[in-house]
Amino acid sequence: MSPNNQNEYEIIDATPSTSVSNDSNRYPFANEPTNALQNMDYKDYLKMSAGNVSEYPGSPEVFLSEQDAVKAAIDIVGKLLTGLGVPFVGPIVSLYTQLIDILWPSKQKSQWEIFMEQVEELINQKIAEYARNKALSELEGLGNNYQLYLTALEEWKENPNGSRALRDVRNRFEILDSLFTQYMPSFRVTNFEVPFLTVYTMAANLHLLLLRDASIFGEEWGLSTSTINNYYNRQMKLTAEYSDHCVKWYETGLAKLKGSSAKQWIDYNQFRREMTLTVLDVVALFSNYDTRTYPLATTAQLTREVYTDPLGAVDVPNIGSWYDKAPSFSEIEKAAIRPPHVFDYITGLTVYTKKRSFTSDRYMRYWAGHQISYKHIGTSSTFTQMYGTNQNLQSTSNFDFTNYDIYKTLSNGAVLLDIVYPGYTYTFFGMPETEFFMVNQLNNTRKTLTYKPASKDIIDRTRDSELELPPETSGQPNYESYSHRLGHITFIYSSSTSTYVPVFSWTHRSADLTNTVKSGEITQIPGGKSSTIGRNTYIIKGRGYTGGDLVALTDRIGSCEFQMIFPESQRFRIRIRYASNETSYISLYGLNQSGTLKFNQTYSNKNENDLTYNDFKYIEYPRVISVNASSNIQRLSIGIQTNTNLFILDRIEFIPVDETYEAETDLEAAKKAVNALFTNTKDGLQPGVTDYEVNQAANLVECLSDDLYPNEKRLLFDAVREAKRLSEARNLLQDPDFQEINGENGWTASTGIEVIEGDAVFKGRYLRLPGAREIDTETYPTYLYQKVEEGVLKPYTRYRLRGFVGSSQGLEIYTIRHQTNRIVKNVPDDLLPDVPPVNNDGRINRCSEQKYVNSRLEVENRSGEAHEFSIPIDTGELDYNENAGIWVGFKITDPEGYATLGNLELVEEGPLSGDALERLQKEEQQWKIQMTRRREETDRRYMASKQAVDRLYADYQDQQLNPNVEITDLTAAQDLIQSIPYVYNEMFPEIPGMNYTKFTELTDRLQQAWGLYDQRNAIPNGDYRNELSNWNTTSGVNVQQINHTSVLVIPNWNEQVSQKFTVQPNQRYVLRVTARKEGVGNGYVSIRDGGNQSETLTFSASDYDTNGMYDTQASNTNGYNTNSVYMIKPAISRKTVDISSVYNQMWIEISETEGTFYIESVELIVDVE
């Protein structure tokens, strides 16, 4: 580079800005003497070297072949990137014309032969003459036939309805496809797969493009649907086959070049770079030829990095190269090649300059290290990374690359030479000069920055990056047609070998730096272009199918975020290309969305570094997303929803949607949903179809466009109405749409349950169940139940209770026959989006909401959190007398619980057979044995209870109480009645049990006895069943429940109880008191009349009575407090006294002197003796 050109550039550090020190070691390495350099003065040597500058080593012819191969491949990739997904004959013809011109140029040497020579030189392996000649001959034939096909395609384009043009293009297509099928094996000859690899890749690319035409034009050519499908399936099969072959043999060739020396690394990296450009970049585009997946223009991006050769002088005559004494292969690989990382771009550079000198007239200032500044897509944060050394510097140089693409660099790798003494020389390799050619990303203006600290008397070699990464051939200047931009700069540094060599990393220009989503095109954003990655998320290297690195998410917390710009208002779908070793769920959040997607396992039993083409699949977010035009950044986060071993994200795709497309999609979805309801004969419902699914299908039909599809909508509505009729007809539940809760037939429910009209989750009416009610210290569950009578059931048949839960906490669901089935549902309220979609008028868009609900339901798993439920229940032998039927019930026992549910149905699933029938028959036998025991137990307790009740009466009509009946007889009978089991259902006490009738019969008779007893006792409320009613008491007196008996408690000596009541004059009465005294002192019950005639009964603790122990059976339900034993201590006594009076009023007073006084009953009854 001439210093006379400095006025054209911005020169940085043409002279040192600071001067710190020279290198401390002047001659770290002295070379062994050579014949050429012994006794030679350095000035003579410099003169000898002058004029022999060679930019690149090796044969010029070979280098030109390599450059031509790379340039042709870059041109092809550029043409392919601009023509992806364009399904029109004009652009396709134009693309084919350009590809043919590149691959079969009108020059003497074959481009295919250049491809062969390129790889031969890279791996130092010649293709056998027979294989080369055969391949070149067949490629020539393919070129001729491709031209004929292109001609036929152009003629058909001009005359699409002409029979000859149509026949010719179809024939030429079939012939060319047959030739590719026949000739492709010639491009992968055994033992020559690697040197043939570029040829194979380019031929495979042409074949796949050809097969794509069958999908694009096949219908217009008159091909049958099955023929088109066959071509499409072949294209998909060959895409995988060709891709896997290319990647496999690329990796094989690269692995063979691994070595131990720096020179071997140079060869290794050159193979990696050039084969990425000629093979992997082409393979990465194969997936985009799938017209069913990519029917529109598609923007694809290549995010892989390639590294140009390290910037050190090489092959200096009689001196050598920088890599002759340099770090090892593995050290250079580690230092120069970045590990997989989030895609970034360079924004600034600080170069650290050191000086190596021999004399004041012979020295080199060189690039000794640097700090690079870079950003991730869409972020404002700047990251920095240090390379090389920043110690003992001469100067620092700062470069600002903000908003610029560096499309080219010119660098000087130099050597500084000194003859230490005759026969010994000292050489130092460094990089003293670089020019950065830049173009502004915003306004296309150009600028050049130069790093050039002063050096003197050095031998330099110019390195032009465009010779390794040429621009596309477009007729435009290179600042417009450049193919790559500088992305990063690494460094090979070793103080021990005195190695200071920068390495430039480049990214393809197709990698957009803003993640702009274009309107009207499918925009692909590679996973590596995420702005941030979360915990348990990392970047892994792609194998070549993907054009760049991948994002790997693991466990529940793995996540990544993308930042994008939408310059125009758009409507689109989101699709993800991925690979995973298990089936699970991911969540999407952003763009006013929050949803979950289920993904299926795509591979197993292999490492993520061994993935093949078919290990990658697609999942699609079902909702159409709308965004408004904005220059602001929009965010989309993707995370793992469940514990997942590995989810590998290749790319996200934004697929534009117009109203017609969305309407067509809605119609197809509605058709699919409605058809799925019916059997093949369309005269019945599919066995597994639920009432909720019928309603959801109806919602989809309602959302169809009346303008575009009026007839289809009408017909689908007729079908879904029939499905609803069939669903209702098979449902054995009464009042399934909750018209009358607690009516004569149907549902019985607790208070507080609401009936809600339909919404986006429920089309029809549904119920909202509140939590259990708390009143004082008691908790009253919320319940809902219904009985299906025995008469509508079939023997030995399985039925199923089904329904849908919008959300719930602690909802218990039961089916009850001879046994009880119970499930508990805790269902999250996650079916509706956080931000409701709205129409242009601001109202909620119910159809969009409905799609969101459907998408959520498609990915939910079958667990306690699932919204749908299904409980089987089997019938055996029917007993119409017992009429057990089937009870269905819902209950919430937690005050904090809640539930919304609807679409309840009990349907017949089918007759039992096989193991299920055998199992039920065994259970039925066990049930009969159990029922026999229950009946025996019932008979015993019922007879004891009935006898106790019979003894209460003096007649058979239960009209007169036995005169000797005391309150203890009544309570004893009551306890026996309460001990009768199976009166109510164990889970729902409101549901009658097998002994409900007997229990009710005895309870009614006992209630009659209590009534007669109350009539007989002249003292109102003498048994305290009505608490303190009728009694005058002081504040400390209370009534307690002891042994299921109401007991009056006088706790202190200063408390009193009294009552005035009416009696019949001149009638003899007996005062009978049942009480006990605790502690010291006495308890008194006194009675007097208007004439102050009185009687007193005295109770003390010494009235101990061993008969004071009671055996009570207090429950009438299974498992509730049965056979409990109570003891009242120290004594319970019953004392009587006779009294009569001429007055019609009497007074009774109760008191005590100390301790506590318990009174169970005070009776004043007519003395019948």
From Swiss-Prot:
Q: Does the keyword Ribosomal protein apply?
A: no
- GO MF term list: signaling receptor binding; toxin activity
Job description of the protein: Promotes colloidosmotic lysis by binding to the midgut epithelial cells of insects. Active on various scarabaeid beetles.
User: What species is this protein from?
Assistant: Bacillus thuringiensis serovar kumamotoensis
Keyword ATP-binding annotated: no
GO BP annotations, alphabetical order: sporulation resulting in formation of a cellular spore; symbiont-mediated killing of host cell
- Compositional bias of kind Polar residues: 15-25
As a miscellaneous remark, the entry gives: Toxic segment of the protein is located in the N-terminus.
Q: Mind telling me which Gene3D superfamilies this protein's record contains?
A: Galactose-binding domain-like, Pesticidal crystal protein, central domain, Pesticidal crystal protein, N-terminal domain
Q: Where is this region: Disordered?
A: 1-26
What protein is this chain from? Pesticidal crystal protein Cry8Ba
Family per record: Belongs to the delta endotoxin family.
In terms of InterPro entries, this protein maps to:
Cry1Ac-like_dom-VII, Cry_V, Galactose-bd-like_sf, Pest_crys, Pest_crys_dom-III, Pest_crys_dom_I, Pest_crys_N_sf, Pest_cryst_cen_dom_sf
Keywords attached to this Swiss-Prot or TrEMBL record, sorted alphabetically, are: Sporulation, Toxin, Virulence
